[in-house]
Amino acid sequence: PKRRTKGQIAIEAGLAPLADQLLDNPTLDPDITANDFINPEKGIEDRKAALDGAKFILMERFAEDAKLLAKLRGMLQRNGHIESKVITGKEKDGAKYQDYFEHSEALSHIPSHRALAMLRARNEGIISLTINPNPSLEDGNAECVRIIADHYKLDVLASPWLKQVAQWTWKIKLALPLENEFLAKIREVAEQGAIDVFAKNLNDLLMAAPAGAKTI
């Protein structure tokens, strides 16, 4: 049987209405609102347990929101950079990859050959690769959290707890899966690009005049 998520367990414990109330009314005080949901019989011993359950429900809901995911993917495609950093102690072994010991390049413009070289270096344990959502900002991840907050209309008056749920959602639920998704896409596009270049070169070779022959 499929393992139940923390959010599903919280829903079974009756905490979905708490999650809904806090999201629908962002200025509510979470601690006061959670008092009505304490239920030791269902394992909700105190306010913290109630709010933890509501947090898991909202995080899973946010992470499965197709419209939100489309906004985040669009932002990463426009502004994201792939960044590489040499793994300490691998400088000598990976000397041929030294161009990528500390490198940053826009996801939307990276050439196939460079993407493949960076992925190869990572697979050989020479460098680490990460996606920076927006390197023009001091904290690129903050842009993703802002998109989540804006999507659910969490403005300056929203409770700090709700804003933290947006942060947790990005950090725990979305950052790594989206990074892996983009790295896989880069590999797919780069490999196809390399195949296309190879095919074109091969075609040019086949269409060329035989060696030693003179075209008239």
Report residues per predicted region:
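Duplex nucleic acid-engaging cores and interfaces of nucleic-acid transaction enzymes
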Residues: 1-215
